[in-house]
């Protein structure tokens, strides 16, 4: 995936998007957009890029919410889709952009998952239970604003560290009995580097987020959670050929969506 990281990375929006259009519909979570809005507006100030509107995505990555956005005239008229927020907001944005065949740019506001750079969307039913996977195209670029990440809830970074820690073990275990072709083999090998940065920098990254301060350690953990695991996901899953991206950790999570708790 193509990405930028840093406290001023939104200033790269005009340059990165220059070949894709001049107008963008921003869709995402209410809190996420509130935290990112000023930096996004400042990032495109003085450029040809116009942010048409900031539209709430509906709160969950369902086909119903995605289809409502697809029917929104502002979304339909925009040259580009900007998806802002956590995994479900990004997954919804991927579905919308794919169905409308528009360029997609993601703006993760939490480091809890790799959805902003993966070619898979987790789709839920309206009652919150897991429905299925949808396989969209990749986002054209991911903007990771480290100042916005530093202002996110500590428990979401903690969850992201746990999610990323499972990547190596799931990838290696689920593919252990198969002869892998080039792409999943590369994904398996990349999964082996997902663990060490979390162990080395995880505690310091959590301290940074408690203090609401960007840091080298927080950047390393953020990149591990979003980019490294995202690369593994893209290389180890396809629509119909193979799926080495999940074992017990994902099964427990998806099972929890259909139980009362």
Residue ranges and their predicted role:
Residues 99-191:
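A glycine/threonine-rich phosphate-anchoring loop and its flanking beta-alpha core
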Residues 10, 33-37, 63, 88-95, ...:
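Short glycine/serine/threonine-rich phosphate/pyrophosphate-binding segments
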Residues 58, 84-86, 244-246:
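Active-site nucleophile and cofactor-binding loops and adjacent substrate-binding regions
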Residues 73-96, 100-110:
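A short, small-residue-rich loop immediately preceding and capping a beta-strand
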Residues 7, 29-30, 84-86, 107-110, ...:
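Fold-independent oxyanion-binding glycine-rich loops
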Residues 181-261:
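Active-site segments that bind and position negatively charged phosphate/pyrophosphate groups
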Residues 1-80:
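ATP/NTP phosphate-donor binding region
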């Amino acid at each position: 995936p193509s990405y930028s990281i840093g406290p001023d990375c939104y200033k790269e929006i005009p340059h990165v998007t220059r070949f894709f259009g001049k107008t963008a519909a921003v869709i995402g979570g209410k809190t996420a957009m509130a935290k990112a809005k000023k930096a996004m507006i400042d990032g495109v100030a003085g450029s040809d890029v116009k942010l048409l509107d900031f539209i709430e995505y509906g709160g969950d990555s369902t086909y119903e919410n995605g289809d409502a956005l697809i029917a929104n005239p502002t979304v339909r008229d925009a040259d580009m889709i900007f998806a802002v927020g956590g995994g479900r907001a990004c997954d919804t944005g991927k579905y919308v952009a794919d169905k409308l065949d528009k360029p997609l740019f993601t703006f993760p506001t939490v480091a809890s998952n790799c959805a902003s750079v993966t070619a898979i969307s987790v789709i839920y039913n309206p009652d919150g239970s897991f429905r299925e996977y949808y396989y969209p195209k990749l986002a054209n670029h991911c903007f990771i604003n480290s100042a916005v990440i530093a202002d996110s809830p500590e428990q979401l970074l903690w969850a992201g560290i746990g999610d990323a820690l499972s990547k190596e073990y799931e990838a290696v275990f689920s593919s252990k009995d198969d002869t892998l072709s080039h792409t999943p083999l590369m994904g398996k090998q990349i999964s082996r580097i997902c663990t060490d940065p979390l162990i080395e920098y995880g505690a310091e990254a959590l301290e940074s987020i408690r203090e609401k301060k960007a840091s080298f350690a927080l950047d390393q953990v953020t990149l591990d959670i979003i980019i490294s695991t995202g690369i593994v996901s893209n290389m180890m899953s396809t629509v119909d050929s193979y799926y080495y991206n999940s074992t017990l950790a994902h099964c427990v999570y998806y099972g929890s969506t259909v139980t009362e708790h």
